[in-house]
Amino acid sequence: MIEGGEDLTFIARRLIISASEDIGNANPTAFIMANNCFQAVGVIGNPESRIILSQCVTYLATSVKSNSSYKAINEAQMMVNKTGNLPVPLHLRNAPTKLMKDLQYGKGYKYAHDHQNNFVDQEFLPEEISGNKFFDSIKET
């Protein structure tokens, strides 16, 4: 791509996308590496940017991979496109006023930090689509 005359910042931008889409949370440092590569390419320019790009490419190529975040956002967006705007469940709504409290906003909300391992079994989706799962951390890698 470099020898073909492709813009170096375009190459670096594609590396950021690859780090997020193809590697994701299997190695979150890959995203940082790719973003730093993009910034360095913008500062350094030719001809030395080829070395920076090479370092980033080899790091990304040898990293563990996971596309679960990419798949999760696709599934979530497909659900929204299918169902349209659905109301936020009442227990997730903020209740800064007496009226909102009287309307049951926030009632029954479980604050994860008050529970073991900062995890709570709680439905976060609207009733019409409750039970759907877009991401499974067990299958992350």
Task: Please identify what each model-predicted range represents.
Residues 1-119, 125-141:
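Terminal-proximal interaction/regulatory segments of ATP-powered molecular machines
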